Regions:
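A well-structured
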Residues: 1-215
Length: 216
C-alpha cells in the first residue's frame, strides 16, 4: 500500500518525479533489507569497519607508490604517469621498460592488496548471503535494475564469442604494429600500445568504408 501511495504521489507531482529513480531503487532493494537494528548497526559502523575505509586505505597506499621512470628520468614517477606511457608511447622498448618498472614497483604491495581484497570481497559475500541475494552479483544487478539472467547472458557471450573477438582484435593489432612500429611479435607490454597509422591518421573515413574495413 505504501509503495502504491508513493507511486501515485510521484505520478501526480512533477516536483516529486525527479525522485522516481531513487524511490524505485529503494523499492527494489526492500525485500533484501535486514532488521532495523541490524541495518542501523551496519550504517553506524560503516565509516570505521566497512569497505569504504579499506578502499580509501588501498587507494591512498597505491597513490604513494613510486616507480622508476622508463624514459630515464632521475625522479621516480607515480603509477598514473607510468601507465600513461604504456598506453601512449609508440616506442616498444620504452613500453617494455615501463611494464618492468611497474612489476618491480608493485613488489611489497602484495600484502596490502591481498588484505584489501579479502576484506572487501569477504564482507560483500557474507552480507549478500545474509540479505538473501541469489548470487554475488545479484545485489549489483538489483541496484542497476538488470535481471540476473541478462547479466549471465552477457558473461556467457564474453566467455564464448568474446574470446574469438579478442583474439581477432589482437591479431589485427599485431599486424598494424608490425607495419607502423616494426614489431615482430606482440608482447605483453604491447597490448595497450597506441595504433599509429602515420600521415593517414587525419583522413576522414565514411561509415560504409569503416564497415567494409571491419568486415574485411
Amino acid at each position: 500500500a505504501a509503495s502504491q501511495l508513493a507511486a501515485s504521489q510521484i505520478a501526480a507531482s512533477p516536483k516529486l518525479a525527479r525522485y522516481k529513480p531513487f524511490v524505485e531503487e529503494t523499492r527494489r532493494s526492500q525485500p533484501f533489507n535486514l532488521s532495523q537494528p541490524v541495518e542501523r548497526a551496519l550504517t553506524v559502523r560503516g565509516p570505521y569497519v566497512g569497505k569504504d575505509p579499506i578502499v580509501q586505505f588501498y587507494d591512498t597506499e597505491l597513490s604513494l607508490l613510486r616507480f622508476e621512470d622508463p624514459a630515464g628520468g632521475k625522479e621516480p614517477i607515480n603509477m598514473e604517469l607510468l601507465l600513461s606511457k604504456l598506453g601512449s608511447s609508440t616506442d616498444a622498448a620504452l613500453r617494455a621498460r615501463a611494464l618492468h618498472s611497474l612489476s618491480e614497483g608493485l613488489k611489497g604491495f602484495e600484502r596490502v592488496a591481498a588484505l584489501s581484497l579479502n576484506v572487501v570481497a569477504g564482507g560483500w559475500l557474507v552480507e549478500n548471503k545474509e540479505r538473501g541475494y541469489a548470487t554475488v552479483r545479484s545485489r549489483r544487478n538489483v541496484s542497476n535494475n538488470v535481471p540476473d539472467s541478462v547479466v549471465e547472458s552477457l558473461l556467457e557471450g564474453v566467455r564464448t564469442t568474446g574470446v574469438a573477438l579478442s583474439k581477432r582484435y589482437y591479431a589485427l593489432k599485431k599486424g598494424v604494429l608490425a607495419k607502423t612500429q616494426g614489431l615482430s611479435a606482440l608482447t605483453w607490454s604491447d597490448r595497450n600500445a597506441p595504433i599509429d597509422v602515420g600521415a593517414g591518421a587525419e583522413k576522414e573515413v565514411s561509415w560504409e568504408e569503416a564497415v567494409g574495413m571491419v568486415k574485411a
